[in-house]
Amino acid sequence: MLSAQERAHITQVWDLIAGHEAPFGAELLRRLFTVYPSTKVYFRHLGDHPDEVQLLSHGQRMLQAVGVAVQYMDNLRAVLSPLADLHAQVLRVDPTNFPLVIQCFQVVLASHLQGEFTVEMQAAWDKFLTGVAVVLTEKYR
């Protein structure tokens, strides 16, 4: 459960990056593929060497989903249920990869927002994104 202050931190950070989902998402994917190359197996549709347009497109979709989660943080299960079904039943993404995505996204936030991304904001985002990952893994059986 997020506190009022944590919710405020999440919303404040999202307001700073909203509208920039594509470049932030592309950078997240580049970092993910560089640091954790084994994750590329879940992005076969991007090919072995995805071009910038592919990264921007998929990165935008990923972060738009995060934006929806931010908008409906009180109702994550209902909002993310279709995405959880997709990842568990269709894409069959190993849920151990979600923390890797979370880590890379937080690095992207920190590198762009620098001093604006405080320790408290990072902690709130870590808690929030971990909650998102929990919801996404609930459909695995």
Swiss-Prot record:
GO terms for cellular component: haptoglobin-hemoglobin complex; hemoglobin complex. Coiled coil: none annotated. GO terms for biological process: cellular oxidant detoxification; hydrogen peroxide catabolic process. Pfam families: Globin. Keywords: Heme, Iron, Metal-binding, Oxygen transport, Transport. Residues 1-141 form the Globin domain. One of its GO terms (molecular function) is metal ion binding. Gene3D superfamilies: Globins. Heme b binds at residues 58, 87. PANTHER family: HEMOGLOBIN FAMILY MEMBER (PTHR11442), HEMOGLOBIN SUBUNIT MU (PTHR11442:SF8). Belongs to the globin family. This is Hemoglobin subunit mu. It comes from Bos taurus. The gene is HBM.
